A protein has these predicted regions:
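Hydrophobic (often cysteine-bearing) scaffold residues that line and stabilize catalytic clefts
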Residues: 35, 116, 120, 214-215
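Acyl-thioester-dependent acyl-group transfer interface
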Residues: 1-63, 71-98, 228-424
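Short amphipathic alpha-helical segments
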Residues: 214-223
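Hydrophobic recognition helices of helix-based DNA-binding modules
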Residues: 127, 131, 225-230
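Catalytic-site-adjacent helices and loops of nucleotide signaling machinery
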Residues: 211
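Non-catalytic, low-complexity flexible loops and terminal extensions
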Residues: 1-9, 102, 114, 118-122, ...
């Protein structure tokens, strides 16, 4: 039952946004200006179609659980200085997401206990489709969008970790257990976001796999940019380590929209300034691909689940569990320098895609130096880089390094973003 938090979603209910990232944002841009009354109707239908997302946090004994959200839905203007900034604000009606808009752009901010980026983008696709349908645009669904006329089925709200119960798990054969370089944490509440675009049609010969596994190609380049700017003298014995959040659905198919990602770690062990790009790439691919085998992913997921269960199960007061979850987050963060999440290919019906010009997630950096999200949409790989320090400088160097290695990339946008707060 979806009122019981999923394994990977549970810790966020105990986590304070002052110490860890508990929310993400989905950004969608249309070719037409948004009308609030139509958007409200589409969203109202969506919360009935996706009841597993229409929940509020509640306390049962010494644990957090969910209860159906009973308040009124609301939509906000993104330029309103008085809009809600915290989950728990009464104007959100108890919901763990906020929908706002400005001109042609729509924003979905959501708490990570209810969904991951893939799950929330599925929800956002349905809202957008219904909005355009209600606006009078002729649309034809090809099966890639869940329609409001379809029926919720229980698998959409199941805990996807149940899929791994019978999967053999084993530690990867090739694994570099490196000490991660940790950078100074900044206390700023806002994030500076820079987006990078890589046209797939301009990828040179020999990079045919880039669009299928872009993180393999992007991680070593971003690690080099971080190393140059943050650790130019190369702290001996420490490495820039990427925490790669892997969407497990392609490996263990699940209909659930609830959190279903696990981290694997990629240490930057050969520098682009010392070896050719292809040599660095082969080394990184070997380390990463070993961790992306089904048994290795199951091992990573089960190890993460074990840490979560140790923190929130068993005896202890609610306050004690909050402290244990904080320690867990700190323990996991110590393994990496930055995080990168490959959400996947964003597929929309052709009749809808021509009306949706942009569609990507923004993941706050939280207790990491930077957080990257990677999606493929409309023939481009879109990388959003978030950070509290000089995101522009590291992203600019990232693009320079991509271009110098014959990967045609360009900086496309920069803005300030304030993630939603949450205080359990």
């Amino acid at each position: 039952m979806f009122l019981v938090p999923s394994v990977f979603g549970r810790p966020y209910l105990y986590s304070d946004s002052a110490t860890v990232s508990v929310s993400s944002r989905i950004v969608a841009a249309l070719t037409v200006h948004l009308q609030e009354n139509i958007l409200y109707q589409a969203l109202s239908e969506a919360v009935r179609r996706f009841p597993q997302l229409a929940v509020s946090p509640a306390v049962s004994g010494s644990e957090y659980c969910f209860q159906p959200a009973s308040g009124n839905l609301a939509i906000f203007r993104a330029d309103d200085p008085d809009q809600p900034e915290c989950f728990g604000d009464s104007r959100l009606g108890g919901y763990l997401f906020k929908v706002s808009y400005l001109h042609k752009t729509l924003f979905f901010d959501f708490h990570k206990s209810i969904a991951d980026e893939y799950g929330m983008m599925t929800f956002a696709k349905s809202v957008l489709y219904r909005y355009l349908e209600l606006s009078g645009f002729p649309l034809e669904n090809d099966g890639t969008v869940k329609l409001m006329s379809s029926t919720y089925f229980s698998a959409e709200g199941d805990d996807p970790m149940e899929k791994l119960a019978e999967i053999p798990a084993s530690r990867p054969v090739w694994y570099m257990d490196a000490e991660a370089l940790r950078l100074t944490q900044h206390s700023a509440e806002s994030e500076r976001v820079v987006t990078v675009r890589i046209p797939i049609s301009k990828l040179r010969s020999g990079l045919e796999q880039f669009s299928r596994t872009p993180v393999t190609y992007l991680a070593p380049v971003f690690s080099e940019a971080v190393s140059e700017l943050e650790d130019p003298s190369r702290d001996q014995g420490k490495y820039v380590v990427a925490s790669i959040m892997v969407n497990l659905r392609p490996y263990f198919p699940a209909a659930s929209l609830r959190p279903f990602c696990t981290p694997v770690y990629l240490a930057y062990n050969r520098r682009l300034t010392e070896y050719p790009y292809n040599t660095v790439l082969m080394s990184q691919k070997k380390l990463l691909e070993a961790q992306l085998k089904s048994d290795a992913l199951a091992y990573s997921a089960e190890r993460t689940a074990s840490l979560i269960e140790k923190a929130v199960d068993g005896a202890g007061t609610l306050e004690q569990k909050k402290n244990m979850v904080l320690e867990m987050h700190q323990q996991m963060a110590a393994h990496s320098t930055y995080s990168i999440c490959r959400v996947g290919n964003i597929i929309l019906p052709d009749s809808m895609q021509r009306l949706v010009t942009d569609f990507y997630p923004v993941i706050p950096s939280g207790n990491q130096a930077y957080a990257l999200s990677v999606v493929t949409y409309r023939g481009e790989i879109i990388v959003s880089v978030s950070g509290k320090s000089d995101t522009w400088a590291v992203t600019r160097r990232f693009v320079e390094l991509l271009n110098s290695n014959m990967i045609d990339a360009y900086l496309s946008d920069e803005y300030i973003f304030s993630p939603m707060n949450y205080h359990p």
